[in-house]
Amino acid sequence: MSTAAATSVAPAPKPKGNLPIFLVLVLLALGLPFLGKGGIIAGVVIGCAVLGVPLFGIIGLLTLAAFVVYLGADQPNEFPLIERSRGLGDQVTLLAVPLFIMSGAVMGRGEISSRLIDFARACIGWIPGGLAMSAVFACVFFAAISGSSPATVVAIGAMMAPTLVKAGYGERFTHGLLTSAGSLGILIPPSIPMILYPIVNQTAVIQVETLFASGFGPGGVMAVIFAASCYAIGVRKNRQEGKPLGPDLYRGLLALLFPVVFYPFLDGGLGMLEVGVKLAVYLVVIEKTTDFSFRQVLRSAGRGFWALVFPVAILGGIYGGIYIAVEAAAFSVVYAVLVEVFIHRALTMRDVLGVFRETGVFLGSLLVIMVAALSFEEFLEARDVPHMLVQWIEGMNLEPWQFLLLVNGVLLLVGMAMDILSAMFVFVPLLAPIANALGIDPIHFGIIFIVNLEIGYLTPPVGLNLFVASTLFERPLGHMIKSVAPFILLMLGGLAMVTYWPDLSVGLGRHIMGDDEAPVVEVPATGGALEELPDETEETGAEDDVPDGVQSLEEMMRELEMGEEGGDLDDDAGDLDGEETDAEDDGRVLSLEEMMEAAGVE
């Protein structure tokens, strides 16, 4: 499947099946231009949607119409399309996008995904619901390699869906789980939206590597929530099959003990030897009392060695300072091709060239959208829209938590109508300055933005994963919407945790990167950032011999001008540029103006 689908929009409503809706849209498109300039622009957008114009065309025409209507067509130099196109060439980070897409597409067609599934089943298949859990963690692992949500759905869903249904899991649960878990691809680094967010957010200097690290916590929370639902479904399935509840609870308790083995080591409380002993005891217990097989784990790990090493090599190299995100993306392409073509022998070079062609098509459509969206951002800045929004929000006297609640509601609605990349280009420039004015960390806001639009992958009418899964599983769109509905509710709970627990993302990300400093704010949204500067009458902090110990700027200037403290100054103090001053003649202290005049300062 071509990745270019990521930038398309839902088909225009067809008159035959949706005639009332179609007629309403046509009337709106024809009538809105009579309502003024804003109506003209809205009419252009709705008219394009009725005609089925692709997304890049809608955004491009929206931008062009906005500039023509508000600035006039006689000033072509004011149109920033060409300048924005040239400016994208200066964004080195942008090169990582097609490279990560290439590597993900190569692995999706190869055998890496199947080997990851085998390893996950060997590790956690013995837990109630373990087969479904293995699908979740295979999605997490594959997402950490490919960075693409639709690619994760296709790669893992194609192999796990028949297996889960055959094992007794309901079809609706199976399809909903695989479609929803696949959306973790945009939250687990490396992630395409995480690469683009620092480019779009012009209010702060954000490192892509720090944003990557900040995605681990929220991604892990979502994965654990899905795994817990799998455990509950697994226990219920076993009870329906007449299996006693006792063993399920025992196995679940053993599974919960696994993090206890490793957390003290990660927290610096235990060394490798202590952890090794605890892990050995843990493995012996579960192997003797459950269906777990350590030998099977080793066998599947050996078979999937190159797949397991991949994320370690990519992310470890980034966080270890070996290479930056762009270099890691280039390395991922070389690694994927070498493994799938020459080690696994699952692909030929002709297959790889086909993947590269598809990636080129996707990148071309993406760049058109980026140029149009960034140009529209230029229009919004020219009309001072972000500043007006900031003033409007500040006038509402919202607390940060209230603003984040409002943002979540807006973005959930946006996710239903726009794909994630387009939503980022349109709404980040509008909302980021407001978040900055309220003191919300730019990285935290970026993670919240991405989690919201991750849910948008599952919501109609343009939820991309719904269309991908509908095609993959050969089921109607209505079936897929019902399948993902319970998982959307679970993800909303995870969204609340991410929103109101900043340390889950920001704290963990900076801990991983060893950076305790917040991103540098470049463009303050309002004058509020300047209010924090010290007043010019504040103390300078330099101690001297005056009675108060510390002099303010005003006091020092007054002393220079009026000679409060001192009488005569040394002759050397009166020398400027090696010349004698008039201070020697009359024995007085020079004023500040006289000193500047003597120094030749205008």
Outline where the language-model segments fall.
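Alpha-helical transmembrane segments of multi-pass membrane transport proteins
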Residues: 2-602
